[in-house]
């Protein structure tokens, strides 16, 4: 069952989403060769708690960390470890926060130092596909229109779109109905209505669309071990149109300060 949100609920979700946005902005300042994912995880937990919120992922389904940090061929759900990042890595950082009983949840894929042109393109196309999907989130359209927009843009650039992992509704639960696949047919699926809140999150691979789960029970990797990118926003339907509740502004400002390249 889909729970459509009123304006007060949407504002509470926005508050949690912006805590995540600011957390990712703080991490953007320090993501560089030599830092470990576990260090990033600790920094994120401290900041989220300082905002009077709780880490949204920690303990959820028994996940052991504040962040899902997925490096290179890891698609999602990577557990932060001690291995330092190196020049040329890409790192997806997925973060959640819970405040006032409502969740925020979004993600950004960062370049660590200098990355190759083909991986720069992967990041750019994945991010573009996110916004193309968001454009479809208008009253009267359907969930399949979102997936089609994401899939079409990624696949016309010869990238693989992950099938087994999807976006979702968001609210008092981290994962609410409906599921939001990153593939689909125009005019298919549930109708989009006023008050719908979604987490749209393209997961796009440099090579095959196929993925497997590692023995840790969490980490998803590409079957061909080629890199994967992941971007995610939280969006509400307000006055019939998509309104993005999260922002990448803090990340982009931090990356400019660091004189890092970003898409």
Model-predicted segments: where are they?
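Active-site neighborhoods and metal-handling regions in enzymes and metal-associated proteins
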Residues: 1-263
